[in-house]
């Protein structure tokens, strides 16, 4: 049994990611990391984030999936964005992505937005959004559309809201009173939280105790704001300051 870090929605915020890594160093031995997508866009350092993940990341990456921003930018499909400023940000990000970044996103990241795997005998699903839509629809407590009963743990991102909850499904298992428990974990966003907490957020799962540590890490937001291009709407700067 081991400890695993769950990281999502970095969004071009290398400063926040580095502080998360500094915090993770102090949490004991970490067997591996689950990455849930949206490494790029909104923030000012998409290329630098990808370079860090590809060349400097100190942990084994067990799961690495596209988020909706990777999908939109790599396929040049901006039709699902809810605002023009979102489209403009994505198109600008696409214009500055390096060949190395494009190669990584094309060849080293799962394009499907979801990944099924096993952790210490537990059946796991990682999905950027949800089974309703792998990229654009989120899981929320009490609103987990889709059938997750085949899994023991479901990791998801996209919403930028951290959560941890359990749901019981009917199952043919008299020993467990015909119930199957599924643990849902959303680590929140490293690079652009929206849950009224401006700190970088991620989670650690201990599969021995099944304890989930929802981490919240301060970082130098002013340093990030100084790096933004004028091509990016100020709205995305304000989200870092307010955490909404």
Model-derived features: positions:
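Active-site neighborhood of phospho(di)ester-bond hydrolases with catalytic His/Asp-centered motifs
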Residues: 7-8, 33-37, 63-68, 127, ...
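Active-site environment of divalent metal-dependent phosphoester hydrolases
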Residues: 11-16, 41-44, 69-74, 132-134, ...
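Short beta-strand scaffold segments in enzyme catalytic cores
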Residues: 112-117, 162-166, 201-205
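Acidic, His/Gly-rich catalytic cores of divalent-metal-dependent hydrolytic chemistry
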Residues: 170-244
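Core catalytic region of metal-dependent phosphoesterases/phosphodiesterases
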Residues: 2-7, 12-102, 106
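Beta-strand-turn-beta hairpins that frame and shape the catalytic cleft
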Residues: 1-5, 116-125, 178-182
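Active-site-proximal segments of metal-dependent phosphoesterases and phosphodiesterases across multiple
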Residues: 81-87, 120-149, 169
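Active-site-proximal loop/helix segment associated with metal-binding centers of metalloenzymes
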Residues: 97, 110, 124, 129-141, ...
